[in-house]
Amino acid sequence: MELEYPEDLRYLETHEYVRLEGEIATLGISAFAVDQLGDIVFLELPELGEALKVGSSFGTIESVKAVEDLYPPVSGTVVDRNQAMIDSPELIADDPHGEGWLLKVRVENPDTALADTLSASEYRTQVAGES
């Protein structure tokens, strides 16, 4: 099965994604990350109001295979957490780019926030080399 990477998302080399709408960014992990992790069993996310900084881990995701740090594609303040995914992290695999989102963040600089992210095409090229 070929994995899909929506064109309206931007990606990090560490397999997180961001969808920016105005100054609110929705963060999650890519279908490739879900595929590589396997069965997800635990998710640790920051609390509402916590500040995220590009390059600094904001949480962890644990599967039967591995524990991975999560990195934000943008800097900002957490304004929403997907409690359903915290309670049942295995559901992330059902729709990682949609209902399986992890956080919503109010972005510090929306105009330049996506400068260090990859387009879907660039990301597809990257993961093709990893699989």
UniProtKB/Swiss-Prot annotation:
Describe the protein's quaternary organization and the partners it interacts with: The glycine cleavage system is composed of four proteins: P, T, L and H.
NCBIfam families, alphabetized: gcvH (TIGR00527), PRK01202.1 (NF002270)
Q: Which sequence positions carry the modification called N6-lipoyllysine?
A: 65
Ranges for domain Lipoyl-binding: 24-106
Indicate the secretion signal residues. none
Q: Which HAMAP family match?
A: GcvH
Q: In the record's cofactor note, how is the cofactor described as bound?
A: Binds 1 lipoyl cofactor covalently.
SUPFAM superfamilies xref list: Single hybrid motif
Q: Report what the protein is called.
A: Glycine cleavage system H protein
Q: Which cysteines are joined by disulfide bonds?
A: none
Q: Which GO terms describe its biological process?
A: glycine decarboxylation via glycine cleavage system
Similarity comment text for this entry: Belongs to the GcvH family.
Job description of the protein: The glycine cleavage system catalyzes the degradation of glycine. The H protein shuttles the methylamine group of glycine from the P protein to the T protein.
Organism of provenance: Microcystis aeruginosa (strain NIES-843 / IAM M-2473)
User: Which is a Gene Ontology cellular component entry for this protein?
Assistant: glycine cleavage complex
Which Pfam families does this UniProt record tie to the protein?
A: GCV_H
Answer yes or no on keyword Hydrolase. Answer: no
Keyword terms of this UniProt record: Lipoyl
Gene name of the record: gcvH
Q: Which cofactor does it need?
A: (R)-lipoate
